[in-house]
Amino acid sequence: MFSKSDFRGIINSMGLVFGDIGTSPIYTLTVIFLLTRPTEVHVIGVLSLIIWTLITLVTVEYAWLAMSLGKKGEGGTIVLKELLVPLIKSGRNAAFITLLAYIGVSFLVGDGVITPAISILSAVEGLRIIPDFQDIGQGAIMFIAGIIAVALFSVQSKGTEEITWVFGPVMVLWFASLAFSGIASIFYTPGVLRAINPYYAISFLLHNGFTGFFVLSEVILCATGGEALYADMGHLGREPILKAWRLVFSALVLNYLGQGAFIIRNPESKNILFEMINQQAEVIYIPFLILSITATIIASQAMISGMFSIVYQGITTRIIPMLKIDYTSGKLRSQIYIGAVNWLLLISVLFMIFEFRDSHRLAAAYGLAVTGTMSITGLMMTLIFYLKGRMFRSFVSLFVTVIDVVFLLSNTYKIPHGGYWSIVIAAIAFSLIIIYTSGQKKLYELMNPMKIGDFLEKYKQVYASENKISGTALFFARDINYVPRYISNVMFENNIIYEDNIFISIIKCESPFGVKSSFAKDLAKGLRVFEINVGYMEVIDVVQILKDKGIQEKTIFYGIEDILTSNLIWKVFSVIKKLSPSFVQFYKLPSDKLHGVLTRFEM
């Protein structure tokens, strides 16, 4: 049985991991039966498709396969790339995998914009079941959804640490409500239990041709958020998430079966979940509606936190430009707030709400990015298992990837119906990553750093002959074997040399977590190297690390790149660099000690 710590982990997982997939029953079946008639045969077939989609794409792909692949317990698209690239000998193939990972991250961004919009909008539409609100206009529904979204995004800067403890119990209550309402409905139409047999899923696809194929594009809505199992593994641990998934899976299946039973009895139903609850117990409908809106807010909060985490991961692995980051918790450094991401997300979510107007139309745009992410995850897992010689898992992963691709192809029909928006958003994110990484590579080539041997030879001469400034000066250098041009400009052209000069090198490790710092070696008299080895998911306080090691700097020098170019792509890169906070702003180094050194580059 479960221990006390197990229960705590399970409840936390329900609140932080399963919000998205847990709120899918609000709209999934309602949207599906806009595409196909709700006959008993169709209902059983669709239910079977949903159950086996949850089994293959969430349980097998993420809970079993993906969660067996981690780095120090951490999961996600970037982790898969970090695992796969070292296994590949060809540089060209490694570059292709890196490109795939960039596309995967971009799809997650595209998905992240639609999730809060469809979740909140579909829950608010439940107001129409209340007699006094039956005639409420869609404009009012959108306005209420917009107000909820604005309120949610507005509190992010204050941090959510104080209220996250509520998320788990609320979602436990939500899943319990889904399970019990499902059981109550199944009791009157037990024939829906046949849907557990995959025969009915296959039969539905075989007998409905293109309609059946297109229905798959809406069936995938039941699995949106499944990728959170793997992405959040590092925060909550593998075991609590897997144990929570058993309970969540059971609640979801029971509720979908219950909704199926309800629509067999009430084929004219337009908002299946809410009408089912209202018919079962009208007196608890309003509390259930409030609970559903709260659950969608929690799901949206998990998505926002996930986006902050993805962007931070991208910044530390140098695929996304630096952005201003605030720490919203005095206890947990992982509790972060990225203002630029927060407000761009809010604008995008509001655009989705007011562009698509209702959840049915929004569902027509939802799924493309999700299936794209799943397909990339499946392909990368297949290659990892194959290259590690784990053939059975490689075969299963390949089978799941084929299913992912089938779902992806079925979603292509959504492109002219609004699906292009997720592609546009993903394309913007992908273009930003490509321009930034290519620009950084080109800029580094132009920097023409001095080899450490040449630098030391000149340094020793200058240090011995020039008057030295008392105190300690810090210089930041990514690789001490190649000294950045700004350092040689300060020391050799401007003749600014301190008694104690320290090169600070922040080295990103292959592991996601861990921080180690130490003085590496003395390069010469008055010249030392201090290394900070940090995991690519770790949030660090550089100022505190320096203080703990007894470093009392008088001045901090850093490089500023001024880019001159007539090339359009590099002009975009130049604008990105100018709009991005500098290295020292990102790490919040004390402004009264900073001295930026400008170097001009022609690209």
UniProtKB/Swiss-Prot annotation:
The keyword Transport is annotated on this UniProt entry: yes
Electron transport among keywords: no
Catalytic activity: K(+)(in) + H(+)(in) = K(+)(out) + H(+)(out)
Subcellular localization(s) per the UniProt record: Cell membrane
Entry superkingdom: Archaea
Keywords: Cell membrane, Ion transport, Membrane, Potassium, Potassium transport, Symport, Transmembrane, Transmembrane helix, Transport
Membrane-crossing segments per the record: 15-35, 43-63, 94-114, 136-156, 163-183, 201-221, 244-264, 284-304, 336-356, 367-387, 391-411, 415-435
GO cellular component, one term: plasma membrane
Lipid bilayer topology: Multi-pass membrane protein
Molecular function GO terms recorded: potassium ion transmembrane transporter activity; symporter activity
Function according to Swiss-Prot or TrEMBL: Transport of potassium into the cell. Likely operates as a K(+):H(+) symporter.
Family named by the database record: Belongs to the HAK/KUP transporter (TC 2.A.72) family.
Protein name: Probable potassium transport system protein Kup
Organism of this sequence: Methanosarcina acetivorans (strain ATCC 35395 / DSM 2834 / JCM 12185 / C2A)
Gene: kup
